[in-house]
């Protein structure tokens, strides 16, 4: 009997080929993982590098230099007056009340000067440790707020953005009460970030931050931020039970603490109390008998460009990427900026360091979408930072050689004109720090 040929020989051969192919590939398929199922490669993280960077930015600047800032001699005189037995609640300079520095700063500066001078540091450097402490508190508070609101990486980015702002350099390295303001703002921001997880800690931080603000730039700034906190539930993002409990606790902490200073000042120096009440109760806005306002918005906007760069640029990038009113931290940052800008616009005092009020929310906004920054924009900011601070470093080294060794001659001539009484004096510790960090910085900006 003749064998009947297959009706579909091409299909049979194709099925056989598919079977052979399946048998050979199936072992490989067992090890295949779709791209969306693969675990992302964990980047190597070195948190200690951030601490080292903050140390390099913050610590060396307080050592081995005289009172450079024009306000530093008065602050130092207030600290000396307190050490010699002056009124703890009323800083004084040459026997006159001095309201431009917080009593809290005077207390802490006096403590460090007594504890560290002269065996560990000179009197100026020891007093500046108060600035180091309050600046560190502010950076920690802002960084932890970024971590709670946005995530761990963004918390570090908040700190990096802050220390990258030129406006923080003076308040973070010189004698003065602005570091207390920065610490208080950092505490407030951190308190807001904890309202959903740690109510008691959030209330303590907010209350203490408001009280510290009332002792620094006056009661008006503290009252403005307290009213801002009360208005946040107008947004549905903040209509949560835990936030209401936090507000009650924060006011229970803040109001008694804020009443301590006027009560103590009245009972220790009634005349100084009435001067404070009538002329300094609201800080730059005056007091109960001298409240005054002006239109200063153009001045502050002009100085904001250099004071808060790159924070404001990164904040604008974030605002263009997401709808801020749909995020809890976005509503907070926008409300904070609105209150601060309103106060700055109406302030009768044109003092550029008041722009410090804007740095925490701008840094928080800037860190939110920092990872999504386009390559071209990121490269520009990187180039701008390298060129700006690189040229500044070159100028400082040239100035050092000109003032101490007479080279370059033209620059040495100008240095002698502006500082005719300068005597060449090279301190070992600053030289060690400068010679250590300069090659490290050059290596960091040239590595691939």
What are these regions (language model features)?
Residues 17-59, 245-253:
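Start-transfer (signal-anchor) and selected internal transmembrane alpha helices
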Residues 125, 129-149, 187:
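Transmembrane-helix motifs of polytopic, lipid-linked glycan transferases
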Residues 57, 74-100, 104, 111-114:
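Extracytosolic helix-loop segments that constitute the early lumenal/periplasmic catalytic or substrate-binding loops
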Residues 43-50, 142-164, 182:
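Transmembrane-helix signature of polytopic, membrane-embedded enzymes
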Residues 75-81, 208-209, 215-329, 333-352, ...:
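Transmembrane-lumen/periplasm boundary regions of multi-pass, lipid-linked membrane glycan transferases
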Residues 42-72, 235-236, 252-266:
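Transmembrane signal-anchor helices characteristic of membrane glycosylation enzymes that use polyprenol
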Residues 147-153, 185-205, 210-213, 322-323, ...:
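Membrane-interface transmembrane helices that cradle and orient dolichyl/undecaprenyl
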Residues 124, 167-181, 217-218:
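Short acidic/glycine- and proline-prone juxtamembrane loop motifs at membrane-interface regions
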């Amino acid at each position: 009997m003749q064998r009947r040929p297959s009706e579909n020989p091409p299909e049979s051969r194709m099925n056989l080929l598919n079977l052979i192919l399946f048998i050979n590939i199936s072992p490989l398929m067992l090890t295949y993982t779709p791209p969306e199922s693969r675990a992302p490669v964990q980047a190597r993280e070195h948190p200690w590098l951030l601490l080292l960077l903050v140390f390099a930015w913050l610590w060396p600047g307080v050592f081995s230099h005289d009172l450079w800032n024009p306000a530093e001699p008065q602050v130092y005189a207030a600290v000396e007056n307190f050490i010699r037995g002056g009124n703890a609640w009323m800083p004084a300079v040459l026997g006159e009340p001095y309201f431009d520095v917080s009593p809290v700063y005077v207390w802490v500066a006096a403590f460090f000067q007594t504890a560290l001078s002269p065996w560990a540091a000179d009197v100026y450097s020891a007093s500046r440790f108060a600035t180091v402490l309050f600046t560190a508190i502010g950076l920690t508070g802002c960084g932890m707020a970024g971590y709670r609101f946005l995530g761990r990486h963004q918390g570090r980015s908040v700190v990096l953005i802050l220390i990258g702002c030129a406006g923080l350099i003076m308040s973070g390295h010189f004698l003065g009460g602005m570091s207390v303001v920065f610490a208080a703002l950092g505490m407030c921001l951190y308190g807001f970030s904890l309202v959903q997880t740690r109510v008691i800690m959030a209330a303590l931080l907010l209350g203490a931050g408001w009280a510290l603000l009332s002792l620094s730039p006056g009661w008006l700034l503290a009252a403005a931020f307290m009213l801002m906190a009360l208005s946040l539930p107008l947004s549905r993002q903040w209509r949560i039970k835990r936030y209401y409990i936090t507000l009650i606790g924060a006011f229970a902490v803040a109001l008694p603490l804020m009443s301590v200073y006027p009560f103590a000042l009245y009972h220790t120096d009634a005349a100084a109390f009435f001067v404070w009440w009538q002329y300094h109760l609201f800080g730059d806005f005056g007091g109960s008998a001298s409240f005054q306002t002006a239109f200063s918005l153009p001045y502050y906007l002009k100085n904001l460009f250099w004071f808060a760069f790159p924070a404001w640029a990164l904040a604008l990038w974030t605002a263009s990427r997401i709808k801020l009113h749909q995020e809890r931290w976005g509503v907070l940052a926008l409300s904070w900026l609105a209150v601060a800008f309103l106060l700055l616009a109406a302030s009768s005092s044109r003092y550029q360091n008041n722009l410090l009020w804007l740095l925490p929310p701008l840094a928080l906004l800037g860190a939110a979408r920092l990872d999504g920054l386009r390559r071209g924009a990121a490269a520009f900011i990187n180039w701008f930072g390298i060129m700006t601070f690189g040229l500044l470093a070159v100028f400082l080294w040239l100035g050092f050689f000109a003032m101490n060794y007479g080279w370059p001659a033209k620059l040495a001539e100008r240095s002698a004109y502006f500082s005719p009484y300068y005597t060449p004096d090279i301190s070992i510790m600053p030289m060690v720090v400068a010679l250590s960090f300069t090659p490290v910085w050059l290596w960091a900006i040239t590595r691939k």
